[in-house]
From Swiss-Prot:
UniProt comment concerning the protein's domains: Contains a N-terminal RVxF motif that is important for interaction with PP1c.
Name of this protein: Leucine-rich repeat protein SHOC-2
UniProt-listed InterPro entries: Leu-rich_rpt, Leu-rich_rpt_typical-subtyp, LRR_dom_sf, LRR_domain-containing, LRR_R13L4/SHOC2-like
Biased composition (Basic and acidic residues): 1-29, 36-57
Repeat keyword on record: yes
SUPFAM superfamilies linked to this entry: L domain-like
Length: 582
């Protein structure tokens, strides 16, 4: 008797490497919880129309690493609808703006096809928002708005801009994201007061040498285009703080990039970079460097001079080693992602290289050993992801990792967990799925802060009674093991919301399961020896997902099973000693 009332997700997919970074981008999954890529933010609008914005979807894959934009956020859409404005209505808005002498006009999300030429009369405007319309061109009259400082044109169908815009001598922010530009309009290079320029998600193939004419530029975002190279003149942008060239087709960077010494955020992820210039070491203000999903095989030693660096993401390249003592030189580094590379050993440099690291992700490499003492100075290390490596054991000083909060050791070849796991008193998340564990240490019960314990796909035949001490546990995954029984102490886990017991050899469930008052998801599927459910299960009033497929539950009528958890609980109440609760 079976029921498809809910299944646990399989999180064990591996992401094979292939030569092309673009192909790897499609296949590889991001590391959960480590180094997520964030969305580029939107320009802010104010006033009564501020709820009519539109959220921009992220082109990035799941996890981690980061977007380096330092932008301002635009409003959320009102009820997800687009305002439809006739020409008369738009003209009315323009007239109102003129009469009230408003300095700000928001015509975003109005399905506007053509902006009336009468806009030229609004010479007092300093902010004009036209994003998320259907504009294919701008009237030349926009060039009359000589006081304009902000012009937001994202999410239209613009293919060019009128030359008259070069009259906008005060323009500081220009947003052209999500249009149909095949090149950066020549007039843009003449807007020498620009400090912020957004060109994300167009069809731009090149940045011209004329970019040197934008000396005040502090933020330049040209991610998600088709740019194959940057001109040497990019090095003349001495005020540049944020440079986002992610999701393009770059193979090299000009050495002149080293002249942009004010850069703090540099996002180069999802390109085809084969190397980095030594001059990158000149970026003494660099705070975040995103290089994930490229084709790098080495990192220049000069990067050690970027002493302000806090986040370094090298995920999914072809790197097998780092320059010796590189990490020790990066004295402010707190987040390091080396996932999906070719490391067989930990980076050379000794314990001091991890003294400032908060999060270390080395998922999907070929490491077979964590060196003894490597984390002896890692007093702030809270997140360690060693998923999908070749570990067969853990170091003898494993129990000294007292600052660890999240530890992922999934998809290795571990046969045992040391008893001194009891020393990891700060641990909240422990992932041990897809290993070769036959039993768990009694010291596990000392992890009183544990919220999530994942032991899926091991060879466990029983659980220690000490598991009853994990009273903060919310998620316990024991799927695909060899369990025949559960300890009665399972009933002490009253904060449990998710319990995965599918694909085991359970013969029964303890009646104490009825004390799991917060249980919402229970997976019992594929237990061939489970013939009945305890009446106490009826006490789990919050249960909303229950999988019992491929279990020979002969006492449950098929129509009850088909009705889902609420029917099953009702049936157990009627048939058992809890019928008074019906």
């Amino acid at each position: 008797m079976s029921s498809s009332l809910g299944k646990e997700k399989d999180s064990k997919e591996k992401d094979p490497k292939v030569p092309s970074a673009k192909e790897r981008e499609k296949e590889a999954k991001a590391s959960g919880g480590f180094g997520k890529e964030s969305k580029e933010k939107e320009p802010k609008t104010k006033g009564k129309d501020a709820k009519d914005g539109k959220k921009e979807s992220s082109a990035a894959q799941p996890g981690v690493a980061f977007s380096v934009d330092n932008t301002i956020k635009r409003p959320n859409p009102a009820l997800g609808t687009r305002k439809k404005s006739s020409n008369a209505e738009v003209t009315k808005e323009l007239n109102k703006c003129r009469e009230e002498n408003s300095m700000r006009l928001d015509l975003s999300k109005r399905s506007i096809h053509i902006l009336p030429p009468s806009v030229k009369e609004l010479t007092q405007l300093t902010e004009l928002y036209l994003y998320s319309n259907k504009l294919q061109s701008l009237p030349a009259e926009v060039g009359c708005l000589v006081n304009l400082m902000t012009l937001a044109l994202s999410e239209n169908s613009l293919t060019s801009l009128p030359d008259s815009l070069d009259n906008l001598k005060k323009l500081r922010m220009l947003d052209l994201r999500h249009n149909k530009l095949r090149e950066i309009p020549s007039v843009v290079y003449r807007l020498d007061s620009l400090t912020t320029l957004y060109l994300r998600f167009n069809r731009i193939t090149a940045v011209e040498k004329d970019v040197r004419n934008l000396p005040r530029l502090s933020t330049l975002s040209i991610r998600e285009n088709k740019i194959k190279q940057l001109p040497a003149e990019i090095g003349e942008l001495c005020n540049l703080i944020t440079l986002d060239v992610a999701h393009n087709q770059l193979e090299h960077l000009p050495k002149e990039i080293g002249n942009c010494t004010q850069i703090t955020n540099l996002d180069l992820q999802h390109n085809e970079l084969l190397d980095l210039p030594d001059t990158i070491g000149n970026l003494s203000s660099l705070n975040r460097l995103g290089l994930r999903y490229n084709r790098l095989s080495a990192i220049p030693r000069s990067l050690a001079k970027c002493s302000a660096l806090e986040e370094l993401n090298l995920e999914n390249n072809n790197i097998s080693t780092l320059p010796e003592s590189l990490l020790s030189s990066l004295v402010k580094l707190n987040s390091l992602t080396l996932a999906r590379n070719c490391f067989q050993l930990y980076p050379v440099g000794g314990p001091s290289q991890f003294s400032t690291i908060y999060s270390l992700n080395m998922e999907h490499n070929r490491i077979n050993k964590i060196p003894f003492g490597i984390f002896s100075r890692a007093k702030v290390l809270s997140k360690l992801n060693m998923k999908d490596n070749q570990l067969t054991s853990l170091p003898l000083d494993f129990g000294t990792w007292t600052s660890m909060v999240e530890l992922n050791l999934a998809t290795n070849q571990l046969t045992k967990i040391p008893e001194d796991v009891s020393g990891l008193v700060s641990l909240e998340v422990l992932i041990l799925s897809n290993n070769l564990l036959k039993k768990l240490p009694h010291g596990l019960g000392n992890l009183r802060k544990l919220r999530e314990l994942d032991l899926e796909e091991n060879k466990l035949e029983s659980l220690p009674n000490e598991i009853a001490y994990l009273k903060d546990l919310q998620k316990l995954v024991l799927t695909n093991n060899q369990l025949t029984t559960l300890p009665r102490g399972i009933g002490h886990l009253t904060n449990l919301t998710h319990l995965g017991l599918g694909e085991n050899l359970l013969t029964h469930l303890p009646e104490e399961i009825g004390t799991l008052e917060n249980l919402e998801e229970l997976y019992l599927n594929d237990n061939p020896n489970l013939h009945s459910l305890p009446f106490e299960l009826a006490l789990c009033s919050k249960l909303s997902i229950m999988s019992i497929e491929n279990c020979p539950l002969s006492h449950l009528p098929p129509q009850i099973v088909a009705g889902g958890p609420s029917f099953i609980i009702q049936f157990l109440k009627m048939q058992g000693p809890y019928r008074a609760m019906v």
